[in-house]
A protein has these predicted regions:
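C-terminal substrate/ligand-recognition segments
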Residues: 286, 321-361
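Secondary-structure transition/capping motifs at alpha-helix termini
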Residues: 120, 262-268, 295, 340-343, ...
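Active/binding-pocket-proximal capping segment
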Residues: 296, 302-307, 349-394
C-alpha cells in the first residue's frame, strides 16, 4: 500500500507525490491530519483555517470521484500527528509514503520524527518540493553561503528557471471507480468551531477549482498590466492568489507556467516578469526561513537589532490594531485586514513601518497580529515582510526609510 500524505498542498493538479504514488500500480490511499492545537500555537487566523478546511472538503470529494480514498485524522499538534501517522501506516499496511517537503522549523522537526519512526519499520518516504519553484538549498553564492539579498538571488533564480525549463507535473493515472472520504465529519466539526465574518466568506473562494479559474482569469485579463497597477491599493491590480498558494490549492509551478508564455509578448512581458518576480520572492523567503531556523523562534535576522528598545505603549498598539490611529490610510488598511482577512502588499509595508518606525513598537507584535487575521497567512512571507519593514531582516529596508502614510499640515493624534 502506498500513502499520499497531504499537508499544505490541497490539490490534485501539479502534485508530484500523487502522480508518483499512482504510477506504481500498487494500491494508493491518501491522508490529511488535522492539527488544531498546532494552529493555536502558531496563531493561525480563523480565516485561514476556514479556507484550508473548505479546501480539504473539496479535495476529499475530488479524490473520491477519481477512485482514491482520503482519510482525515485528528492529531492535535505535530507531536500527535507523528503518532497518528505511525498508527495509520501500521493499520493500513503502508510500505511507502509520498509527500511534499515543508520547510519551517516545527514542520522539519515533525518530519524528522516521522522519518525515524517509519524507516525503523521499513517504510520508505519519498519527499518532493512542489511547494516552491527552486528548493531552499539549491542556490548558493560563490562562497557557498545562502543568498541574503533578493536582487542577487533573483538573478540566480532566473538562470535556474531558464536552464531547467520546467514542465507541468503529469496528470495522475487515476484508478477509477468511487473512493471514500473517511473523516469528512471531522472537517465539518472543525468548521463549526470557527467564527469567521461574512465579509471574509463572501470574498474568498477556497479549493483547487476556484484557484485554477482565478489564475486563468488573471493571466488572460490582468497579467500584462500587473507592473503598472500592482502598487495602487485602490485598484484590483493584484492576482488575489496568495491564499491559494498558501494553502496549496494552486501549485507555484502551475502559476509560473501560466505566466511564462507572456514573457515572449512585447505588451505583456513587463507585467509577467514582475509577477513571476513575486514567485521568486516567495522562494527567497522560504530559503531564508529554512537556512536560518532561529527566525522561527522570534529572533531578528540581524542579531544586532535584538538590542533595540521597543515601546510597550499598549494604547498605541491597540489603536493600530483597531484602525484608530488617526492616519486615514493606515486605519483603512487595518480595518480591511480585520474585515476581509487580506491587505494589499503596499499597505502591509506601510502599516508595518508605521507600527515599528512611527510608534516604535516591536515588529513581532505586528507579525503575530497579521497572522491572527490573514487568510493567506504564511510564516516565511509574513516574517520576511515584517523584518524587512522594521529593518531587522534580510535585504531590509534602511532604518531611516519610512513610508509616507499621511500628508497634512496638522499631524493627527492617536485616540
Amino acid at each position: 500500500m502506498r500513502l499520499v500524505w497531504f499537508r499544505n498542498d490541497l490539490r490534485c493538479h501539479g502534485h508530484t507525490p500523487l502522480t508518483q504514488a499512482l504510477a506504481g500500480g500498487d494500491a494508493v490511499t491518501a491522508l490529511h491530519i488535522l492539527c488544531p492545537d498546532q494552529w493555536d500555537a502558531h496563531g493561525v487566523a480563523p480565516a485561514r483555517r476556514w479556507f484550508v478546511l473548505h479546501s480539504l472538503l473539496e479535495l476529499g470529494e475530488s479524490l473520491a470521484a477519481r477512485g482514491v480514498d482520503l482519510h482525515v485524522l485528528d492529531g492535535g499538534d505535530f507531536d500527535g500527528s507523528v503518532t497518528a501517522l505511525e498508527n495509520f501506516v501500521a493499520e493500513q499496511g503502508v510500505t511507502e509514503v509520498f509527500c511534499n517537503r515543508e520547510y519551517p522549523l516545527n514542520e522539519l522537526n515533525r518530519d524528522r520524527a516521522v522519518a525515524r519512526r517509519l524507516e525503523a519499520q521499513g517504510v520508505r518516504i519519498h519527499g518532493f518540493d512542489d511547494g516552491v519553484l527552486v528548493p531552499p538549498r539549491a542556490l548558493h553564492t560563490g562562497k557557498g553561503t545562502p543568498y541574503t539579498v533578493f536582487t542577487a538571488y533573483r538573478k540566480r533564480w532566473d538562470v535556474w528557471m531558464d536552464d531547467l525549463q520546467p514542465e507541468a507535473v503529469p496528470a495522475p493515472d487515476w484508478p477509477g471507480g468511487q473512493g471514500r472520504f473517511v473523516g469528512r465529519e471531522r472537517v465539518e466539526r472543525a468548521l463549526e468551531t470557527l467564527s469567521v465574518p461574512d465579509s471574509v466568506t463572501a470574498l474568498w473562494h477556497p479549493g483547487e477549482d476556484a484557484a485554477r479559474g482565478q489564475l486563468k482569469d488573471f493571466v488572460e485579463q490582468h497579467l500584462g498590466d500587473y507592473k503598472a497597477r500592482r502598487d495602487f491599493p485602490a485598484e484590483p491590480g493584484t492576482s488575489g492568489l496568495s491564499a491559494a498558494l498558501s494553502a496549496g490549492t494552486l501549485a507555484p509551478l502551475d502559476a509560473y507556467l501560466a505566466a511564462r508564455p507572456a514573457l515572449q509578448d512585447a505588451k505583456a512581458r513587463e507585467g509577467a516578469a514582475t509577477w513571476i518576480g513575486e514567485l521568486a520572492w516567495r522562494d527567497f523567503y522560504r530559503q531564508i526561513m529554512h537556512r536560518f531556523p532561529s527566525l522561527a523562534t522570534g529572533a531578528p535576522f540581524r542579531p544586532e537589532t535584538a538590542l533595540l528598545q521597543w515601546s510597550d505603549n499598549e494604547e498605541h498598539f491597540q489603536a493600530w490594531c483597531e484602525g484608530r490611529t488617526g492616519y486615514p490610510l493606515v486605519d483603512a488598511a487595518m480595518r480591511q485586514l480585520v474585515q476581509t482577512g487580506w491587505m494589499h502588499n503596499r499597505l502591509r509595508m506601510l502599516t508595518a513601518m508605521f507600527l515599528t518606525k512611527h510608534l516604535f513598537i516591536d515588529w513581532r507584535k505586528g507579525e503575530r497580529f497579521f497572522m491572527a487575521h490573514l487568510v493567506d497567512g504564511d510564516f516565511a512571507a509574513n516574517n520576511g515582510g515584517w523584518q524587512w519593514s522594521a529593518s531587522t531582516g534580510t535585504d531590509a529596508a534602511p532604518y531611516f526609510r519610512v513610508s509616507v502614510s499621511y500628508t497634512h499640515l496638522t499631524l493627527p493624534t492617536i485616540y
